[in-house]
Amino acid sequence: MTALGAEEIRTRVESDFSRIVDVLNQKIALQSISAKGITADHMKRSAQFVADLLREVGVDTKVVQSHNPDGTPGAWEVIGSKNVSEDAPTVLLYAHHDVQPVPDPNVWNTDPFVGTEIDTRLYGRGAADDGGGIA
């Protein structure tokens, strides 16, 4: 595997930009809220979504549910790995795919779970933290 330079990465992102935005919009719409008392269904769908994205680029993945210290079911997590070369360094990528509840939707100018572009920025719950990195 050959290392990519900054210009090559920039070119690839620019050529794939509309797909990246589409993926981010899909991620925002999943409403992957992680909070006590909220069903984990959205989190499971979000984890599966992230796992599917990783599989598309050749990463072996599995979706697992963690357990809280008290033994109750915890968050849904994605574990992935890809061995490109035995002599390549190990690289760890970490991101969270959940969002926190929206305390007061009335303070939002847009629907928090619909990606909305305003002046070249995309707004939506989790768009920057960490949805953008996932997309």
Listing of model-derived features with the role each one plays in the protein:
Residues A128-A135:
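Active-site alpha-helical elements of protease catalytic centers
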Residues T2-A127:
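Acidic/His- and Gly-rich active-site-bordering loop/insert found
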